[in-house]
């Protein structure tokens, strides 16, 4: 039996780039049925990054907007996920631990299933609390390996990082190529065999 491949739809920069098109919630809700009808997405990114700021610029209620955007996907059995900047939460600058913890409770209440956490420095100390907070809120914790190319950032480096995150309780591991410089061959090696399989051996 062949391995089933599931696709996740991620909207890059849709809400955080002032120079690009940013949608209102009524436009998002309108396009949701088309995304569902495609029948190929198991997950859809519904919030995170600068989503709330854009809502406010349009005079929308961020809390209401996220609930409206996640609702059609949940009804179709599609999971929703968000971006989380570890120490910064959903913001661009560090936030106190209690505020960061509250982010997860609010996002879960709004209908978000998965938190995709990353730290640009790959500092596990910044990611670890996110794993705990996500689980406490009833969310799936997906942790990212921020990919780059250097003598230090080897396959062993990323495999070791993934194993540490799994040990801390990460439910899933994500490869995040923020700068677009990850090499295809290297990315393949990060997954063969998977860190979770290596942990078992």
Can you name each region flagged by the protein language model?
Residues 14, 117, 173:
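Conserved, mostly hydrophobic/aromatic
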Residues 40-41, 112-114, 170:
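A structural motif
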Residues 17, 41, 55:
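Metallocofactor- and cofactor-centric catalytic cores in central/energy metabolism, strongly enriched
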């Amino acid at each position: 039996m062949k391995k089933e491949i599931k696709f996740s739809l991620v909207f890059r920069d849709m809400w955080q780039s002032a120079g690009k098109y940013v949608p209102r919630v009524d436009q998002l809700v309108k396009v949701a049925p088309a995304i569902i009808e495609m029948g190929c997405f198991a997950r859809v990114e519904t919030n995170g990054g600068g989503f709330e700021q854009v809502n406010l610029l349009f005079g929308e209620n961020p809390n209401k907007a996220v609930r409206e955007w996640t609702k059609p996907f949940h009804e179709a059995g599609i999971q929703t996920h968000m971006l989380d900047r570890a120490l910064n939460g959903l913001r661009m600058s560090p936030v106190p631990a209690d505020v960061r913890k509250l982010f997860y409770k609010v996002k879960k209440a709004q209908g978000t299933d998965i938190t995709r956490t990353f730290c640009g420095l790959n500092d596990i100390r910044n990611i670890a609390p996110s794993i705990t907070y996500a689980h406490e809120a009833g969310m799936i914790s997906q942790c990212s390996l921020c990919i780059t190319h250097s003598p230090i950032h080897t396959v062993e480096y990323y495999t070791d990082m993934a194993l540490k995150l799994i040990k801390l309780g990460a439910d899933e591991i994500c490869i995040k190529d923020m700068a677009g410089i990850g090499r295809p061959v290297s990315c393949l090696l990060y997954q063969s065999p998977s860190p979770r399989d290596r942990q078992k051996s």
